Amino acid sequence: MKMIIAIVNDEDSEMVTHTLTGKEFRVTTIASTGGFLRRGVTTLLCVFEDEKLTNALDVFRGCFPKAGAESQKRCRIFVLNVAET
């Protein structure tokens, strides 16, 4: 299994959550503050089977298309392995 931990700006969190749940991913959201994107961020947690990783990442790519080098960072994604017990 895999887990995505995504740190997104508050104004983007609802759109990303809605898109993920529309693709049948389950998402937990946590309001957070910290070093990556500073204030006004939401942490999204999403766990799924290994074969769905590409689909999940495609959702994020669709929500955050690549912009110019000077654009503001809107999302940080971490992909972790999850041990089943």
Predicted regions and their residues:
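Positively charged, small/polar-rich N-terminal and surface patches that mediate targeting and assembly
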Residues: 1-85
